[in-house]
C-alpha cells in the first residue's frame, strides 16, 4: 500500500549520492531490495464500512486506487527525483507531457521563448502552437527586455540551450520576470543538479526531460516538473490525472533504477564533455596543434560549449561542472554528414544524456538550423577513446 513518508527530505543532511538511493525507502511495500514493478491498474479500497470516506478532492492519498492517478512505482520515482531536484516534483510520461502539463496549468496570455533557428527545444514550440489553437497564446522571443511580457505571463528559459549548449543567466531573467509579475520557467534538461540548480538560482518552476541525464540509458521516456511550492505540485498532479499523462509503472521502475547511479554518471558526463569540447576547440583555434595530428583546422569553424563562454554569470550558474551536450559548426554540410556517419564510438542518433555518446547532424530534426551544425552528446566512455575517434575521422576528411 502506498503511504506518505514519515520523514521530510529537507531534514536529511546527507549527500546527493546517499539521498538518491534512500529517498524512496519509506515507500517500500515489501522487503525486496530492488523495488518490484506494480502493473495493476486498480486497487482494493482499504477500510471497513465504518471508516470508508467519500471522495472530496483529488490530492495525495494515503493509498492508491487507480493507476491513472498514482502508483507505488511512480511515487518512488518522484521521491528520488525530488531528492535530486531539491523540491517536490511531478513525473510525466514524457518531457513534452511535462511541458504541456505546466503550460496548461499556468495558462498564460503571452510566453517568451528562444527564437527558432537560434536554439531551443522544438517540442516546446510545437506545444505552444497547439495551445495557441485553444487559447490564442501569444509568443515573443527572449531578449534582455522581454517587453511583451506582463502580469501572469511566462518567460520560458532554456539553459544551457539546445542544441548549442550555451548558458543564459537565470538570476537576470528571474529579476526581469519579478519586475513584470511574470513566471520564470527554466528547462534545465542539459544541466540537472548538481551541475546547475535552477530553483536555487530563482526559477519558479524547473522542467527536465527525464529521458535524458536523469534516466540516462536510452530506455526511458519521461518528464518531470519541480517547484519549491508544494501546493503547485499537488495541483499539477491532479491535472495529470485528467490529462492521462502519468508515467507507466515499468518506465517509473527503470527511471528509479537509473537514478540510483545518477550522481556517478553526471560527474563523468561533465568531465568528458569538458575534455572533448576543449580538445575540439583547440583543433579549431590552434593550427599547429591540429596539423601535428594530421587534421585541417579549417574543418571546425566554431565550438559552442558553456566552458568556452567567458561571461562571469556562467560559473555562478553552472556551479557543479559543465554540460556534456554541445554543438560544433563545421566547414560544410558534407563534412558534418561524414563525421556523423564515420565515427566508431558515437551513435548517429538524436537525443542526449545517455551513457553512450551520440552525434547528430541537426538537419535531421531541425529544418531551420545551419546545415553545417552537428550536436554531440558525450557519454561516459573513456574520454581519450572518444577524442581519438574524432581525431581519426577529422584526419580522414583533411
Swiss-Prot record:
Keyword Lyase belongs to the record: yes
Single Gene Ontology BP annotation: transsulfuration
InterPro entries named among the record's database cross-references: Cys/Met-Metab_PyrdxlP-dep_enz (IPR000277), Cys_met_metab_PP (IPR054542), PyrdxlP-dep_Trfase (IPR015424), PyrdxlP-dep_Trfase_major (IPR015421), PyrdxlP-dep_Trfase_small (IPR015422)
GO cellular component terms, semicolon-separated: cytoplasm
SUPFAM superfamilies per record: PLP-dependent transferases
Modification sites for N6-(pyridoxal phosphate)lysine: 212
Gene3D superfamilies registered for this protein in UniProt: Aspartate Aminotransferase, domain 1, Type I PLP-dependent aspartate aminotransferase-like (Major domain)
Superkingdom of this protein's organism: Eukaryota
Keyword annotations from UniProtKB, A to Z: Lyase, Pyridoxal phosphate
Cofactor dependence: pyridoxal 5'-phosphate
Recorded coiled-coil stretches: none
GO molecular function, one term: carbon-sulfur lyase activity
Short name of one Pfam family: Cys_Met_Meta_PP
Stated family: Belongs to the trans-sulfuration enzymes family.
PANTHER family in the record: CYSTATHIONINE GAMMA-SYNTHASE (AFU_ORTHOLOGUE AFUA_7G01590) (PTHR11808:SF35), TRANS-SULFURATION ENZYME FAMILY MEMBER (PTHR11808)
Protein's recorded name: Uncharacterized trans-sulfuration enzyme C23A1.14c
Species in which this protein is naturally found: Schizosaccharomyces pombe (strain 972 / ATCC 24843)
Lineage, broadest ranks: Eukaryota, Fungi, Dikarya, Ascomycota, Taphrinomycotina
Amino acid at each position: 500500500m502506498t503511504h506518505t513518508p514519515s520523514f521530510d527530505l529537507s531534514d536529511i543532511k546527507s549527500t546527493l549520492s546517499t539521498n538518491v538511493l534512500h529517498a524512496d525507502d519509506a515507500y517500500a511495500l515489501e522487503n525486496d531490495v530492488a523495488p518490484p514493478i506494480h502493473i495493476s491498474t486498480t486497487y482494493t479500497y482499504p477500510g471497513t464500512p465504518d471508516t470508508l470516506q467519500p471522495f472530496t478532492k483529488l490530492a495525495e492519498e494515503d493509498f492508491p486506487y487507480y493507476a491513472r492517478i498514482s502508483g507505488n512505482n511512480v511515487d518512488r520515482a518522484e521521491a528520488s527525483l525530488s531528492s535530486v531536484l531539491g523540491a517536490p516534483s511531478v513525473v510525466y510520461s514524457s518531457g513534452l507531457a511535462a511541458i504541456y502539463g505546466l503550460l496548461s496549468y499556468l495558462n498564460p496570455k503571452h510566453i517568451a521563448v528562444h527564437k527558432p533557428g537560434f536554439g531551443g527545444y522544438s517540442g516546446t514550440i510545437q506545444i505552444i502552437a497547439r495551445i495557441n489553437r485553444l487559447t490564442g497564446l501569444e509568443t515573443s522571443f527572449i531578449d534582455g527586455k522581454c517587453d511583451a511580457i506582463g502580469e501572469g505571463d511566462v518567460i520560458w528559459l532554456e539553459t544551457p540551450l539546445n542544441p548549442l549548449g550555451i548558458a543564459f543567466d537565470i538570476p537576470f531573467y528571474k529579476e526581469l520576470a519579478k519586475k513584470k509579475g511574470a513566471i520564470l520557467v527554466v528547462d534545465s534538461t542539459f544541466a540537472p543538479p548538481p551541475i546547475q540548480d535552477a530553483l536555487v538560482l530563482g526559477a519558479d518552476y524547473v522542467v527536465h526531460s527525464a529521458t535524458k541525464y536523469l534516466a540516462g540509458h536510452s530506455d526511458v521516456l519521461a518528464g518531470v516538473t519541480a517547484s519549491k511550492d508544494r501546493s503547485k505540485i499537488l495541483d499539477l498532479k491532479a491535472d495529470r490525472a485528467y490529462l492521462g499523462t502519468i508515467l507507466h509503472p515499468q518506465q517509473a521502475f527503470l527511471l528509479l533504477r537509473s537514478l540510483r547511479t545518477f550522481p556517478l554518471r553526471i560527474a563523468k558526463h561533465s568531465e568528458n564533455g569538458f575534455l572533448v569540447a576543449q580538445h575540439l576547440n583547440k583543433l579549431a583555434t590552434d593550427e599547429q596543434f591540429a596539423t601535428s595530428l594530421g587534421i585541417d583546422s579549417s574543418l571546425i569553424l566554431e565550438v559552442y560549449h558553456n566552458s568556452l563562454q567567458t561571461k562571469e554569470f556562467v560559473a555562478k550558474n553552472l556551479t557543479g561542472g559543465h554540460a556534456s551536450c554541445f554543438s560544433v559548426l563545421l566547414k560544410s554540410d558534407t563534412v558534418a554528414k561524414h563525421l556523423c556517419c564515420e565515427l566508431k564510438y558515437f551513435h548517429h542518433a538524436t537525443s542526449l544524456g545517455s551513457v553512450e555518446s551520440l552525434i547528430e547532424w541537426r538537419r535531421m530534426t531541425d529544418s531551420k538550423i545551419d546545415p553545417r551544425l552537428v550536436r554531440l552528446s558525450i557519454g561516459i566512455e573513456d574520454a581519450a577513446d572518444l577524442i581519438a575517434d574524432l581525431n581519426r575521422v577529422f584526419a580522414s576528411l583533411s
